[in-house]
Amino acid sequence: MIKDIMTANELVMPNQKEINVLKEYFPSCFNADGTFDMVRFSEFLKDKIDITHEGYELRFLGKNYSKMLASLDTETVIVPDEAHNSLPENVNSENVYISGDNLDALKHLLKSYAGLVKCIYIDPPYNTGSDGFVYNDKFNFTVEDLVEKLSIDEEQAQRILDLTNRGSASHSAWLMFMYPRLQLAKDLLDKDGVIFISIDDNEVSNLRLLCDDVFGAENFISCLSVENNPKGRKNSDFIAVSSEYCLIYSKNKEVAHFIENVPKAASDMTLDENGNYVHNSGKRVLVGENNFNTVSYTHL
């Protein structure tokens, strides 16, 4: 099976996900030789959508490369952590904990949970210069591989490989790290799913543009200011920064919704073996600490 995946990965292109979507929903736009009929595709759109030629996009070194990484299938395997899972408190757990590279972990999750996840929260590297972030996704591509797969020249291919090999912490490296992970997270979300992403001043502007690219600017919900240090950080220049941010995007803003008015008073909560909770709109909502356990897996 792994050999088949490796063979299929050899043929993956940066726009493979988009091509798959077009083939699924617009099969009549593909000719017998596999070429895409843009004129026929335009016929589907002309009376149903306003078209603009004044858009803008985020560009960075390695963008097509990171899109290709999102399309590659993982060549790792999941190995259950039997010692952890056999503990009495974990035997009947319904949760899953995967330990390993998060890019591979997301791809494994997609095999079972694509389009099923209601809510995702991630706390990525902030790329502050002191948080230890360096780009470390390792793939055995050559300059010739990237020239062929990405349709770029040798100079740009070499720059991408140099960036990936030296463990860069540049803005481009951070964006290249984040792009495939956000794309895979989007694929996990249900049609009414939402994602929350913590970040600070160092990359919040880039993250906003990146999320607009992945989720669509129309699916932006909010950028929350989150106070995390009321006194302010001592190493701040000019102004003592006391807060970070939480970006919120939906898979589809038209159908996304939030449960309103979760009570905070203890008198409005119920306590059981799993922790404090309230019932709101017919749904159980956990509040505060809880005692849910996890099943642990490690992938190789």
Please identify what each model-predicted range represents.
Residues L163-I221:
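Conserved Class I SAM-dependent methyltransferase catalytic core
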Residues P125-T128, N202-V204, N228-K231, K253-V255:
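Conserved nucleotide-binding/hydrolysis micro-motifs of P-loop NTPases
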Residues M1-Y121, Y126-P180:
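DnaQ-like (DEDDh/DEDDy) 3′-5′ exonuclease domain used for proofreading
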Residues K111-A114, L209-A217, A240-V241:
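Short, surface-exposed basic-aromatic patches at helix termini and helix-loop junctions that form
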Residues G232-V287:
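Flexible, glycine-/basic-rich loop-and-beta segments that form/coincide
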Residues T298-H299:
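Conserved small/polar residues in nucleotide/adenosyl-binding loops
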Residues N219-P230:
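Conserved S-adenosyl-L-methionine
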Residues H108-L109, D131-G132, S205-L210, K234-D237:
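A short acidic (Asp/Glu
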